């Protein structure tokens, strides 16, 4: 098993519901360490750059609009198989299809306002972590 880092974003809908602590408790209960964290209100440019991979998709504008609608909580998580573990904790993208007890089943309202983002692979995790935490802001514990 490998120690990995992954990026997690608690999206504006979940921040507004005041469930950051409950989501953090799930990360920690699953053995994931929060090695960097910050709350920010993304600019449109930052959101467009971060989600550039989806630029040609029909949902891109709505995704960007949603991500700039309020503050987000961004964290780098570290642990054994952190990427898969975080994706399991999040549940399916559509909260109606997410397993009971997952973050999205418990806190998300729709496929758009789906509470959290998580890196989907090691390559994207590395790019996403460095996008929000360039260099010295990530601390191994």
Swiss-Prot record:
Its main location: cytoplasm. One of its GO terms (biological process) is CTP biosynthetic process. It holds the Pfam family NDK. It catalyses: a 2'-deoxyribonucleoside 5'-diphosphate + ATP = a 2'-deoxyribonucleoside 5'-triphosphate + ADP; a ribonucleoside 5'-diphosphate + ATP = a ribonucleoside 5'-triphosphate + ADP. One of its GO terms (cellular component) is cytoplasm. Keywords: ATP-binding, Cytoplasm, Kinase, Magnesium, Metal-binding, Nucleotide metabolism, Nucleotide-binding, Phosphoprotein, Transferase. This is Nucleoside diphosphate kinase. It comes from Cupriavidus necator (strain ATCC 17699 / DSM 428 / KCTC 22496 / NCIMB 10442 / H16 / Stanier 337).
């Amino acid at each position: 098993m490998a120690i990995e880092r992954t990026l997690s974003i608690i999206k504006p809908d979940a921040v507004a519901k005041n469930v950051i602590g409950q989501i953090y408790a799930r990360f920690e209960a699953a053995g994931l360490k929060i090695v960097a964290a910050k709350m920010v209100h993304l600019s449109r440019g930052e959101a467009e750059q971060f989600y550039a991979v989806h630029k040609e998709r029909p949902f891109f504008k709505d995704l960007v609009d949603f991500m700039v609608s309020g503050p987000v909580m961004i964290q780098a998580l570290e642990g054994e198989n952190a990427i898969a573990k975080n994706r399991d904790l999040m549940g399916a993208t559509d909260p109606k299809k997410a397993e009971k007890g997952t973050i999205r089943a418990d806190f998300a309202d729709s496929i758009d306002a789906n509470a959290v983002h998580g890196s989907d692979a090691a390559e994207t995790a590395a790019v996403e972590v460095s996008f929000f935490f360039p260099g010295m802001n990530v601390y191994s514990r």
